[in-house]
Amino acid sequence: MGFTLAIVGRPNVGKSTLFNRLVGRKLALVDDLPGVTRDRRIHDAKLYDLKFQLIDTAGLEEAANDSLEARMRAQTEAAISEADAVLFVIDAKAGITPADSTFAEAVRRSGKPVVLVANKAEARGSEAGMYDAFQLGLGEPCPISAEHGQGMPDLRDAIVELLGEERVFAEERQEEAADEVFTPAAVGALVGDDIEDPDAEEIPAYDATKPLRIAIVGRPNAGKSTLINTMLGEDRLLTGPEAGITRDSISADWEWHGRKIKLFDTAGMRRKARVQEKLEKLSVADGLRAIRFAEVVIIVLDATIPFEKQDLQIADLIIREGRAPVIAFNKWDLIEDRQMVLADLYEKTARLLPQVRGLRAVPISGERGQGIDKLMENVVKTHEIWNRRISTGRLNRWLEGVIAHQPPPAVSGRRLKVKYMTQVKTRPPGFVVSCSRPDAMPQSYVRYLINGLRETFDMPGVPIRLSLRTSDNPFAGRAKKKK
């Protein structure tokens, strides 16, 4: 294996659950009782295209030197010294504890590169824990759910960014140079074929060296496979007038103007009432997994019959999953009064999908290859916005002006106070606002803030997450500790 990672953290934050997921089987004992893991375990692990050695450690414990807990801590410290990098795991649901802060300091002193992993991020209230995690000084937290397999693509990207592509793919590239073998069949592999984790059917494969991952979705017979065939310049995918030809999520590598792309064609997504065959149910589920794995999702609409109920349900699903959507109005060659029809489609896009104001939409003909460059320009731009980070200073200068112009309303005779804002994640952009009485804040004012962020910082067409919490600022706790 090319490199070694150590999973480190206080007891009961989910280290062994993450270990089991990455090694592909339940090798580590998992229980709610702290201290279940007493020794460090080392095993070959895989996260999409990353192959490495993984060390599971006992929960870090503060203890007397002659105690069992002290020996467990020694095992953990040995694991840190052996590893190339550390996955420091916290419980986002429980928030930051004094033990987290103590052992984060120990990890920093080791000098090893660190990915801060915010586990249990699917739980209600986890946003506050991720917000507090910045005080550990270990960088931006990577939110995941080890139990449910959520956030694994982001964890993979964080590891590559931390160690660098040359380091993490060194062994793989050496093998490729020695073998000089390329198998075209692998390009069209079914999503999830080469995954060995315990829920392989839930997590699609991630191929190559960080290409832009695009899923192409839509109702049956909207022209998804035809579009991909035109992009690739070959008949890679079966197409025809019959709805539902594509049964699986098919992946294909592509390069557009020097940019590496991973395309996923998905089975047509029907209404639940019409999904009757077991195979088709599995195909739709596979399409949902492709959406969750993708970064940008192209929603292919038949321009002759656009915006049916199912189209809007698909778009809503993509937005709720936090992906970056782009609409392709396909079969544009069949439209006669194009200027009038396009104006009508733009108006419907804005009216029917207000939750992603500024959603990019492009007319294309997948069969004739028209509009594909324009579509891809919008895909790349949307991907850049989806990854955008705004400094805390800029955010709070903007927030000060917003409050001066339109302060929050008074509720029950008391004015709500908005104190502080910071960005806690990207992909999609996520923000936390510190305020008094978050539960009393009207959703209309939250939407007002989101729309202001979108307009001021030029973030059209992507989901924006905004959470409220009670706290003066993220450094208040740190200041108190120094006294």
Swiss-Prot record:
Q: Does the keyword Repeat apply?
A: yes
Which InterPro entries does the annotation name? Answer: G_ENGA, GTP-bd, GTPase_Der, KH_dom-like, KH_dom-like_a/b, P-loop_NTPase, Small_GTP-bd
Keywords, comma-separated and alphabetical? GTP-binding, Nucleotide-binding, Repeat, Ribosome biogenesis
Looking at the record, the residues that make up the KH-like domain are 388-472
| UniProt KW Transit peptide keyword | no
- Which Gene3D superfamilies does its entry note? 3.30.300.20, P-loop containing nucleotide triphosphate hydrolases
Picking any one GO biological process from the record gives:
ribosome biogenesis
Domain EngA-type G: where? 3-167, 212-387
Residues the record lists as binding GTP 2: 218-225, 265-269, 330-333
**SUPFAM superfamilies from the UniProt entry:** P-loop containing nucleoside triphosphate hydrolases
One GO molecular-function annotation for this sequence? GTP binding
Taking the record's annotation, the residue ranges forming a coiled coil are none
Q: Name one Pfam family in it.
A: KH_dom-like
The superkingdom listed in its UniProt entry is Bacteria
Q: Which N-terminal residues, if any, form the signal peptide?
A: none
Task: Provide the binding site for GTP 1.
Answer: 9-16, 56-60, 119-122
**Role this protein plays:** GTPase that plays an essential role in the late steps of ribosome biogenesis.
Q: Which family does it belong to?
A: Belongs to the TRAFAC class TrmE-Era-EngA-EngB-Septin-like GTPase superfamily. EngA (Der) GTPase family.
Q: How does it assemble?
A: Associates with the 50S ribosomal subunit.
- Tell me which HAMAP family the record gives: GTPase_Der
Instruction: Please identify the protein, giving its name as recorded.
Output: GTPase Der
Q: Which organism is it from?
A: Brucella suis (strain ATCC 23445 / NCTC 10510)
